[in-house]
Amino acid sequence: RVLGMGEAMGKAGGPEVSAMQDAVRQSMEDGAFGIGSALIYPPGNFASTEELIAINSAAAPYGGVYITHMRSEADNFLEAIDEAIKIGTEAGVPVEIYHLKAGGQRNWHKAAEAVAKIDSARAAGVDIQANMYPYTAGGTGLTACFPPWASADGKLFDNLADADMRGRIRAEIENQTEAWENLCSLSTPEGVLLLGFNKAENRKYMGRYLADVAAEVGKDWIETAFDLVLDERQRIGTIYFMMSEENVAMQIGQPWMKFGTDAGGIDPETATGLSHPR
């Protein structure tokens, strides 16, 4: 997506899709095993279903696999599974779903239906599986609480420094009008654990919840998140507690389920920060 469109929003045209397909073919010939997508993050979430089918079709003749962090793991969780199945079926590639979960208490009831959807697709001949981490929290950046368009064209920090844009971002967070995953809303600020600070003066917030930090600085959680990200000028590694133990146990029992850390390697002797227990 970055090769064809940079970090811009919008639909990829024919020449851009062709460039992406050429890159896929070359990568497959070089030894890649498939296509990975991260559809809640910019710029990946700017890609349409049709674009994803097209680039996966280029990997299909090489035996490529489609591995996806789906477009939703929460409010549109079931629709995201439908999209993954559609991409795999129409492109002719197997599908692997990254860290399957129903995020946010209001969505916990969807986990059983998600498993049923996957079972049904498998029974119909679709090669689809999933992986998970056996833990009730996920890890990503604090920027996952901001609408994706705020990061378009690589301008997140500029936008946070601009009063008008900051106001627009806040308005979308407070009254969501578009389909995107607000992980702070799903976890609640009381379930958002801050970990990844670079600046010495901010490390006092490491291992503390966003709600606590906001109370300490005397601002609401949105303004606190804006200030921290702008000051750090990085996404700030964050843990989001948003899954249920019952669903974790239920998913573990599925015969097509695998386990993955979804994490980077850490040297315990030299690491200075906190890490996800996965």
Feature locations, PLM:
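Active-site neighborhoods of metal-dependent hydrolases
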Residues: 1-14, 20-41, 56, 86-89, ...
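Divalent metal-binding pocket/active-site signature
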Residues: 17, 26, 32-83
